[in-house]
Regions:
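Conserved N-terminal entry element of GNAT/NAT acetyltransferase domains
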Residues: 2-32, 198-227
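Active-site/acyl-donor-binding loops of N-acyltransferases
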Residues: 2-18, 56-57, 134-200, 259-260, ...
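A conserved beta-strand-loop-helix scaffold within acyl/acetyltransferase catalytic domains
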Residues: 22-110, 218-302
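Short loop segments at secondary-structure junctions
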Residues: 79-82, 115, 172, 178, ...
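Conserved glycine-rich acetyl-CoA-binding loop
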Residues: 111-122, 304-313
Length: 389
């Protein structure tokens, strides 16, 4: 969904005003605020979306259905003339951990007009003080938001390297053209190889994917999340009671990837044993049209015990598909596959990001201590809102 999500833009592309202002009031947002919130986003340089798509973030969210009686959709800053000058959305998500259901908040669409930006922390403070929430997770943190999170004692997600990405070039000519067309040169670590032929020769010296035991003929694609995903989720949760996992039922997956599926920008690949799923991956098209870059990202991979090796055939399959279809780049944001329970994956290229994108804060002290242990984390780009739009 092309919606209003980029924290760094929302706080860094201001509406130009210089007059002194009075402190705005803080109140709970409601669906009737949509027009003012959309206007706020637009005047701060962000894209908008239709009311139906915006409201569906909550109305169609299975976790919101469960908790809507006491779950705010967010908070707004409002002037004495009832003008909305700030907003921070509050998306609910259900996680499982050690047999318990955790209520998790994902703050989204943080934006404040420049004249009122000194009051922006009121919104974050309210998020951290809401009742009945166990954990707050952010996964699209920009550089301008990071200092505020640190001030509110948010911690970096300890698994993954969330200020880096790793990638494979799948179309050398297209990739080289997009790098040269980019003013900001986001892939400056490979700019010394701007010519596609040189890049190709370099990669031919590397083994992009080691030999795997399973044939990619075992892989199937799905046009939707079918009933097998429910049984897969219950098996996955049962096998991993000590891992913090976002709920991945058929209903939740369908909601999360609904807009990507409608745009035909998500690809679901699966492996099965008989009629039962044993592993799946979701790849998502996330292009950068201003630079002419065509890009696919791995946003989620899950497997039952004993089927972790399916990661490699999945990557090999999508690599060839990208190559065949002229996609320039296959990327993994945050390097979250670097876990001892998964087979090693070696991408030939890496790039540095402008911030550490994934932070969390536990609301109670006991959970806060537990979450310091890296072995209970198994994050991916499914968490938070990184692949929601």
């Amino acid at each position: 969904m092309d919606t209003l999500k980029n924290t760094s833009q929302g706080l860094g592309t201001p509406e130009r005003r210089t007059e002194a202002v009075r402190q705005p009031s803080l109140r709970r947002a409601n669906f009737e605020d949509y027009e003012q919130i959309a206007a706020l986003q637009i005047r701060n340089g962000l894209a908008s979306t239709c009311y139906q798509a915006w409201a569906a973030l909550w109305i169609d969210n299975p976790a919101y259905h469960k908790w809507k009686a006491d779950w705010p959709i967010g908070w707004v800053l409002q002037t004495g003339t009832d003008k909305v000058v700030g907003f921070l959305g509050n998306l609910p998500a259900e996680y499982q951990f050690r047999g318990h259901e955790l209520r998790v908040s994902t703050p989204v669409s943080w934006v404040v007009d420049e004249s009122y930006r000194s009051y922006s922390m009121l919104l974050l403070d309210r998020i951290t003080r809401q009742k009945g929430v166990d954990l707050v997770i952010l996964t699209t943190v920009g550089p301008k938001a990071e200092p505020g999170l640190k001030a509110f004692k948010f911690s970096k997600v300890p698994v993954g390297t969330w200020n880096e990405s790793e990638f494979w070039i799948t179309n050398y000519r297209g990739f080289s053209q997009s790098v040269l067309a980019s003013e900001s040169i986001p892939f400056s670590n490979v700019i010394s190889y701007p010519i596609s032929a040189i890049l190709f020769c370099r990669d031919k010296l590397k083994q992009l994917f080691r030999e795997v035991d399973r044939s990619t003929s075992d892989i199937e694609t799905c046009s939707e999340f079918d009933s097998r995903f429910d049984q897969f989720w219950y098996s996955l949760a049962h096998q991993n009671p000590n891992i913090l996992l976002a709920r991945r039922t058929r209903e939740t997956l369908a909601w999360h990837f609904r807009d990507a599926m409608l745009r035909h920008s998500a690809c679901i690949v699966t492996a099965s044993k008989g009629s039962d799923l044993t592993a799946y991956a979701v790849f998502q098209r996330q292009d950068k049209p201003e630079h002419g870059l065509k890009r696919v990202r791995l946003v989620d991979f899950q497997s039952l015990k004993g089927f972790e090796q399916m990661l490699l055939p999945f990557l090999s399959w999508i690599f060839r598909k990208c190559n065949d279809e002229g996609i320039d780049l296959l990327e993994i944001m945050g390097r979250w596959l670097a876990r001892p329970d998964l087979p090693p994956v070696f991408a030939p290229y890496h790039r540095r990001l402008c911030s550490w994108s994934s932070y969390y804060r536990a609301i109670n002290e006991e959970l806060s201590e537990i979450l310091k242990q890296s072995d209970i984390w198994a994050p991916s780009s499914f968490d938070g809102d990184a692949s929601l739009w």
